[in-house]
């Protein structure tokens, strides 16, 4: 069951896209960098990588073991495919968080030109 705390956490989550990075507050940028660093640590974790590969191999083995074409067999195929898509989506979200962190760091390191009047670069 969803609790009010869970709903509030979902509604106040930080959503980031490339168009809003330049307009974000410093606290939000720090949060993006923190989440990106955590995601990067997870992606570099060898145990997690081995677990994910083993999990996917087990799912593929169970998928190849389904030989029938009944409605129940088709439902099993769909369920296993959804599990594979879910784990791939999880890894993609980690990679996206790392990319956003790197993008924020790059934008913060770029020097801003000090232009006066109508100077042209």
Outline where the language-model segments fall.
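Intrinsic-disorder/low-complexity detector
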Residues: 2-121
């Amino acid at each position: 069951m969803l609790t009010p705390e869970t709903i509030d956490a979902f509604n106040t989550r930080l959503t980031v896209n490339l168009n809003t990075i330049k307009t974000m507050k410093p606290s939000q940028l720090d949060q993006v960098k923190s989440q990106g660093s955590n995601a990067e640590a997870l992606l570099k974790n060898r145990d997690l990588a081995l677990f994910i590969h083993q999990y996917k191999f087990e799912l593929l083995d169970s998928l190849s073991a389904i030989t029938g074409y009944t409605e129940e067999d088709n439902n099993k195929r769909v369920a296993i495919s959804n599990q594979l898509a879910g784990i791939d989506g999880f890894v993609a979200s980690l990679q996206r968080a790392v990319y956003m962190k790197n993008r924020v760091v790059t934008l913060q390191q770029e020097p801003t030109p000090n232009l006066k009047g109508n100077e042209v670069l």
